[in-house]
C-alpha cells in the first residue's frame, strides 16, 4: 500500500458490495451458532419427554460432531467447484432443515438424524462463509474479515440463550426449533443478493471445473475403498461418542482407526502437501482440546463448585460468551497489525496469565470472576477467530474451502473429546483445578505448533519439493519454510 492509502481508515478500503458480503456471511454464522446450541439449552426437556438415558441425551450433542468432518469435506468441495456463495447458501439451508426437523421429531432416532444434518450444515457454513468473506476483502484486511465473521457464532449462542428464556416457558421446547425456518428465508435472499467471492471468481471465470476433494476421494481410482472407509469412520465415531462403550482400549482403537482414515484422505487429496494438512488437523485438534473443556464444563463448575443459582450462572456465562465475541474482533485487528501467527501466539500467552486466577478466585465476588473470564476468553478463545485465515493460507484457492472445512472439522473432534478429558481429570482433582491445568498445559502446545509454524516446518522436513513459502491469502512469508538462522532473503515466492 502507498503512504496515502495507509492514512485512510481501514473500513474505507471496503466498498458497499464487500460490506454486504460480510454482513450476509456474519448473519449466516450467527444463525449457525444459534441453531447449534439450541439442543444444549433444551436437553433436559427433551430427555424428559422422550424418556432418554443420560447417555442417549448426551449423544444428541455428540451427533453433530460425528458428521461435521464429512460436511466440511462435501460442502467445501461444492464451494471449490461451484463457488463459495452456493456452498454457503446450501449450508444454511441444511442446518436450518435439521433444526426444523428437531422440532417435529417424534422420538430419539429422528432427532439424532436431524442432529447429524445440523452438524454437516454447520461444518459447511464454517468453511464456505470463512472463505467467502476472506476472499472478498482486500488482502491487508483479511484477518479482520476472519475475526469479525467468527464473532457471529458467539453472538448467536448469546441470542439463543435469551430467546430460550422467552419462548420455552410459554410455548415449550419444540417452538424453539421451529424458529429454524427463518434462516431458510434468509438463505433464499442471499442467493439473489450477494456477489461471488473475488478470489474464486478470478480463478475460475471461463475455466474448466476444478478437481475437488470429493472427485479425488469418491470418483477416483480408490473410490470403493474410500466409501467403505467413510462408513467405517462414521460407525467408529458413533460408537466412541454415542455408543456407551465402557472399554477404554476399544475406544482408543476406534479413535486410532479414525485418525488413520482421516490421514489417508488428506494424503490422497493433498498429494505431496499432505504433511501440511496433517499438521493443520493437529493444530485445530489441540485448539479445541485447550478451549472446549471450559466451554463445555464451565456451567457445571459454576453450579456445583461455586454453588451459583441459575440467574448468576447465566450472568457469568454472558461475560464469557461476550468476551469470546469481542476477542474475535480484537484478534482480527491484532492479526492485520502483527501478522496472523504472531498475533495468535501473543494473545494465547497473555491468556495464560489469567487462566489460573479464573479458577483460583472462588465464587465470593461474581463481578471479578466475570471480568476475569471476559478477558481470559477474549484472549484465549477469541483469537480463534483468525484460525480460518491461518488455515486457509496454506491452501490454494482451488482447494481452500474443502481443505479448510475438512482439516478444521476433523480437528474439531477435539471438542467432543475435551469435556471427557476434563471430567476424567476431575475424578482425581476438583473440577476447577482440572479445567485450569488442562487448558493451561494444552494452550502451550498450540503456542508451539503455531509459533514455530510447524505445518510449514514439517512440510520442509518430509516433502520439501512441495513447500509453499508464502501465505496464499495475504502473500506474507511462512517462517517455517526456511531453517532456523537463515536469512529472510531465502524466501522465494512459490506456488503449490
Swiss-Prot record:
The chain crosses the membrane at residues 22-42, 58-78, 86-106, 116-136, 148-168, 170-190, 224-244, 247-267, 278-298, 313-333, 353-373, 374-394, 406-426, 431-451. It is found in: Cell inner membrane. InterPro entries: MFS, MFS_dom, MFS_trans_sf, SA_transporter. Pfam families: MFS_1 (PF07690). The keyword Hydrolase does not apply. Gene3D superfamilies: MFS general substrate transporter like domains. GO terms for molecular function: carboxylic acid transmembrane transporter activity; sialic acid:proton symporter activity. It catalyses: N-acetylneuraminate(in) + H(+)(in) = N-acetylneuraminate(out) + H(+)(out). Keywords: Cell inner membrane, Cell membrane, Membrane, Sugar transport, Transmembrane, Transmembrane helix, Transport. SUPFAM superfamilies: MFS general substrate transporter (SSF103473). Its main location: membrane. One of its GO terms (cellular component) is plasma membrane. It is a multi-pass membrane protein. Catalyzes the proton-dependent transport of sialic acid. Belongs to the major facilitator superfamily. Sialate:H(+) symporter (SHS) (TC 2.A.1.12) family. This is Sialic acid transporter NanT. It comes from Salmonella arizonae (strain ATCC BAA-731 / CDC346-86 / RSK2980). The gene is nanT.
Amino acid at each position: 500500500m502507498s503512504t496515502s492509502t495507509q492514512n485512510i481508515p481501514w473500513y474505507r478500503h471496503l466498498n458497499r458490495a464487500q460490506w454486504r458480503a460480510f454482513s450476509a456471511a456474519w448473519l449466516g454464522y450467527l444463525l449457525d451458532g444459534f441453531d447449534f446450541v439450541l439442543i444444549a439449552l433444551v436437553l433436559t426437556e427433551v430427555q424428559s419427554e422422550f424418556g432418554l438415558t443420560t447417555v442417549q441425551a448426551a449423544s444428541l450433542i455428540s451427533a453433530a460432531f460425528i458428521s461435521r468432518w464429512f460436511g466440511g469435506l462435501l460442502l467445501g468441495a461444492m464451494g471449490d467447484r461451484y463457488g463459495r456463495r452456493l456452498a454457503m447458501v446450501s449450508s444454511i439451508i441444511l442446518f436450518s432443515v435439521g433444526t426444523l426437523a428437531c422440532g417435529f421429531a417424534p422420538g430419539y432416532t429422528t432427532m439424532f438424524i436431524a442432529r447429524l444434518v445440523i452438524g454437516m450444515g454447520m461444518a459447511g457454513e464454517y468453511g464456505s462463509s470463512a472463505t467467502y468473506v476472506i476472499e472478498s476483502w482486500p488482502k491487508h484486511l483479511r484477518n479482520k474479515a476472519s475475526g469479525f465473521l467468527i464473532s457471529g457464532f458467539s453472538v448467536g449462542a448469546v441470542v439463543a440463550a435469551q430467546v430460550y428464556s422467552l419462548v420455552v416457558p410459554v410455548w415449550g421446547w419444540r417452538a424453539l426449533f421451529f424458529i429454524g425456518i427463518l434462516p431458510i428465508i434468509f438463505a433464499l435472499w442471499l442467493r439473489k443478493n450477494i456477489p461471488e467471492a473475488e478470489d474464486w471468481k478470478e480463478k475460475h471465470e471461463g475455466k474448466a471445473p476444478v478437481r475437488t476433494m470429493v472427485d479425488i476421494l469418491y470418483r477416483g481410482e480408490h473410490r470403493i475403498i474410500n466409501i467403505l472407509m467413510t462408513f467405517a469412520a462414521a460407525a467408529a465415531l458413533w460408537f466412541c461418542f454415542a455408543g456407551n462403550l465402557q472399554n477404554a482400549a476399544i475406544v482408543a482403537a476406534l479413535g486410532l482407526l479414525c485418525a488413520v482414515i482421516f490421514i489417508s484422505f488428506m494424503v490422497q487429496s493433498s498429494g505431496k502437501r499432505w504433511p501440511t494438512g496433517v499438521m493443520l488437523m493437529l493444530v485445530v485438534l489441540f485448539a479445541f482440546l485447550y478451549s472446549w473443556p471450559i466451554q463445555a464444563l464451565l456451567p457445571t463448575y459454576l453450579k456445583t463448585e461455586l454453588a451459583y443459582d441459575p440467574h448468576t450462572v447465566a450472568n457469568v456465562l454472558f461475560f464469557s460468551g461476550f468476551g469470546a465475541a469481542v476477542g474475535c474482533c480484537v484478534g482480527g485487528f491484532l492479526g492485520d497489525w502483527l501478522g496472523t501467527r504472531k498475533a495468535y501466539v501473543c494473545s494465547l500467552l497473555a491468556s495464560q496469565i489469567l487462566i489460573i486466577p479464573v479458577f483460583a478466585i472462588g465464587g465470593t465476588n461474581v463481578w471479578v470472576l466475570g471480568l476475569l473470564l471476559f478477558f481470559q476468553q477474549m484472549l484465549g478463545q477469541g483469537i480463534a477467530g483468525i484460525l480460518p485465515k491461518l488455515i486457509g493460507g496454506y491452501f490454494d484457492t482451488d482447494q481452500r474451502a474443502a481443505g479448510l472445512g475438512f482439516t478444521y472439522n476433523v480437528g474439531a473432534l477435539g471438542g467432543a473429546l475435551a469435556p471427557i478429558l476434563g471430567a476424567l481429570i476431575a475424578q482425581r482433582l476438583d473440577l476447577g483445578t482440572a479445567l485450569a491445568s488442562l487448558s493451561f498445559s494444552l494452550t502451550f502446545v498450540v503456542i508451539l505448533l503455531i509459533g514455530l509454524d510447524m505445518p510449514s516446518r514439517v512440510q520442509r522436513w518430509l516433502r520439501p519439493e512441495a513447500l509453499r513459502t508464502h501465505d496464499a491469502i495475504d502473500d506474507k512469508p511462512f517462517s517455517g519454510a526456511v531453517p532456523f538462522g537463515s536469512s529472510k532473503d531465502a524466501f522465494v515466492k512459490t506456488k503449490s
